[in-house]
């Protein structure tokens, strides 16, 4: 939620996905300062002003737990989310990866990773996950 009466109309609700990492670049942009390269987020200002339709098509999610509980510790994962799909790759568990078709299954109840009809999507999501990991490492 951002309130800026001099630059953003009240009630704006962009449909694009915003991330917490976008907050600092947005505030810097609104203050008239360009964010540095150390920021992985992007300014939401164009979306809030209604001037940009070009936006990220995917984003990276990573989770690593502590070592208190061995089973939970082994559940670290890296994931990529697009508008229609979520691909999850577990760090320490083999053959446990997941793919969800969010358009058909918004509650993520059916893992379609082994469904042959999704083989091309799995490959694309794996490539996109690696691209995002390379971009943020």
What are these regions (language model features)?
Residues 8-10, 21-24, 29-98, 102, ...:
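C-terminal cap/loop subdomain of S1 sulfatases and analogous C-terminal strand-loop tails that border
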Residues 105:
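Intrinsically disordered, low-complexity polar regions and short flexible loop motifs
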Residues 114:
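Phosphate-coordinating loops and pocket residues in cytosolic domains that bind phosphorylated ligands
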Residues 13-18:
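Glycine-rich "substrate-gating" loop/helix at the edge of Rossmann-like oxidoreductase active sites
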Residues 1-9:
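The feature captures the short pre-catalytic strand/loop hairpin that immediately precedes
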């Amino acid at each position: 939620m951002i309130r800026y009466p001099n630059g953003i109309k009240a009630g704006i609700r962009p449909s694009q996905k915003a991330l917490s990492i976008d907050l600092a670049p947005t505030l810097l942009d609104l203050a008239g300062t360009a964010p540095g390269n150390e920021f992985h987020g992007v300014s939401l200002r164009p979306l809030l002003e209604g001037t940009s339709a070009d936006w990220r098509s995917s984003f990276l999610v990573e989770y690593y737990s502590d070592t208190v509980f061995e089973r939970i510790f082994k559940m670290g994962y890296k994931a990529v989310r697009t508008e229609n799909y979520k691909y999850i790759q577990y760090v320490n568990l083999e053959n446990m990866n997941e793919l969800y078709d969010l358009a058909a299954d918004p509650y993520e109840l059916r893992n379609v990773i082994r469904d042959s009809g999704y083989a091309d999507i799995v490959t694309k999501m794996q490539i996109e996950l690696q691209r995002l990991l390379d971009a943020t490492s």
